[in-house]
Amino acid sequence: VTAVGSFGYFISPIFTNYSLIEYGWNYTLFLFSLFLVTGLIAAFFVRSPKDNEIIENRSDQSLKEALSEALESKSYILLISGFFVCGFHITLVGTHVPKYVMDRGLEDWTAAAILALIGLFNIFGSLLSGYLSTKISKKFLLSVIYLLRGFSIAFFIFTPPSVLSAFIFGASFGFLWLSTVPATSGIVAHLFGTKFLGLLYGIVFLSHQIGSFFG
């Protein structure tokens, strides 16, 4: 699901840059509104499995007990903290890189290309992360992803500005963009089961969005 969503992120910067230049922001916003309506219509056709017991733990644990167990877990708190940093990274790059690129003397299309590359390579990064999550330690995988993100950002900041370095950054950071999601959700499911996975992962994702706000 994450990989497919990234395809939209790949198309969006290219389409937006072209539409803003050719038709202006009014028409561009109208088209994005149509895309949003299409997504809302599709959501009405999503159906839950007929037998929820297939995907839930057979447990009599209450919601209060699940929350208490999670919030007392050091691993869960660290996961929340890590996803805060993830959200900070995501918005920092998505919001400030376009202006940063132009401030360093590159043309504005370079920023759109970076964002498009992020979306494109995130398709492969998310798929690989999901696969590796079933083969190696999810905690180790998540640590490596965050470490490589730091290297990718440092490379972009400290290397001389060029189209090549911008493209390398877009591809490398895109590969790591949302590759944290499969490992993170997998860790939550491994620690606490799937009965309250939606809520417990939702809390982790809330931390991600708070990090995005500060980014």
Say what each PLM segment does.
Residues F10, G87, T91, G174-P182, ...:
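Small-residue-rich segments within alpha-helical transmembrane domains of MFS-like 12-TM solute carriers
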Residues A3-F7, F84, A116-L120, L147, ...:
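Transmembrane alpha-helical cores of Major Facilitator Superfamily
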Residues V4-D51:
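Helix-loop-helix hairpin linking two adjacent transmembrane segments in secondary transporters
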Residues Y9, L178, L191-G215:
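A late C-terminal transmembrane helix in Major Facilitator Superfamily
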Residues P13, L71-Y131, G215:
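Extracytoplasmic gate region of multi-pass secondary transporters
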Residues A116-N122, L128, S133-I187:
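C-terminal transmembrane helical hairpin of 12-TM major facilitator-type secondary transporters
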Residues V1-V4, I187, G193:
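Cytoplasmic helix-loop-helix junction between adjacent transmembrane helices
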Residues R47-E65:
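Flexible cytoplasmic inter-helical loops of multi-pass small-molecule transporters
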